[in-house]
């Protein structure tokens, strides 16, 4: 019975890990130190975004874009931080500032600045039921094309610094390789585990 319980608990914990996907740290612009990471928790249905970049400029990332290195086809989900704070926006498909979503679905958990580097952590539901928001998935190896941009100051304005990259939401790799001994085998009354 103890062996069955042990095996069952290992299988359940492995299943729980398999529901989490992540992009890992995606370098958007190495010279500026601009990165983003999306961690999707399939157990809680929450996605956590960590955006890191210079503290003296506005920063933006657009999700699931189809427009290559341009302003997208229109309607793509944008997360933008500027002098007014973190905003949920969407691309218009033209050379205009992204529209502010009527529903602000990102909740900023933290916004810290250390030595000129801003780190923003924000969360939201995987599916917000907002037609302007990207629906995150826990499916392994899901493609997530990204557009990025940042300005020359903290007020949203024209920018020349922008680009596109491809990312993938993959199952997080968790290294669990502890060495241990289990004895005696077979067990009669008492099982010993030595780490």
Describe each region flagged by the PLM.
Residues 1-22, 171, 176:
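Bacterial Sec-dependent N-terminal signal peptides
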Residues 20-31, 65-85, 128-170, 178:
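Acidic/polar low-complexity flexible segments
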Residues 21-52, 105:
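Early extracytoplasmic/domain-onset interaction patches
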Residues 35-40, 107-113, 182-183:
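Short amphipathic beta-strand and strand-loop transition segments with alternating hydrophobic
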Residues 39-91:
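Surface-exposed, glycine/proline- and aromatic-rich loop segments on solvent-exposed faces
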Residues 46-48, 56-58, 117-121, 141-145:
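Extracellular structured ligand-interaction cores
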Residues 86-132:
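Structured beta-strand segments within beta-sheet-rich domains
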Residues 173-195:
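Surface-exposed, proline-anchored Ser/Thr-rich loop/turn motifs
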């Amino acid at each position: 019975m103890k062996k069955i319980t042990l095996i069952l608990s290992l299988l359940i914990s492995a299943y729980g890990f398999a529901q989490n996907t992540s992009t890992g740290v995606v370098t958007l612009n190495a010279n500026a130190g601009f990165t983003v990471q999306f961690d999707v928790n399939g157990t809680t249905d929450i996605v956590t975004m960590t955006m890191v970049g210079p503290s003296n400029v506005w920063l933006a990332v657009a999700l699931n874009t189809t427009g290559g290195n341009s302003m997208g086809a229109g309607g793509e989900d944008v997360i933008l931080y500027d002098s007014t704070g973190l905003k949920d926006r969407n691309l218009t498909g033209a050379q205009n500032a992204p529209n502010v979503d009527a529903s602000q679905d990102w909740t900023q958990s933290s916004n810290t600045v250390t030595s000129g580097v801003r780190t923003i952590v924000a969360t939201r539901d995987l599916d917000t039921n907002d037609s302007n928001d990207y629906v995150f998935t826990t499916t392994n190896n899901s493609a997530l094309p990204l557009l990025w941009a940042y300005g020359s100051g903290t007020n949203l304005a024209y920018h020349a610094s922008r680009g596109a990259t491809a990312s993938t939401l993959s199952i997080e790799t968790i290294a669990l390789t502890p060495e241990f001994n289990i004895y005696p085998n077979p067990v009669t009354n008492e099982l010993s585990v030595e780490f």
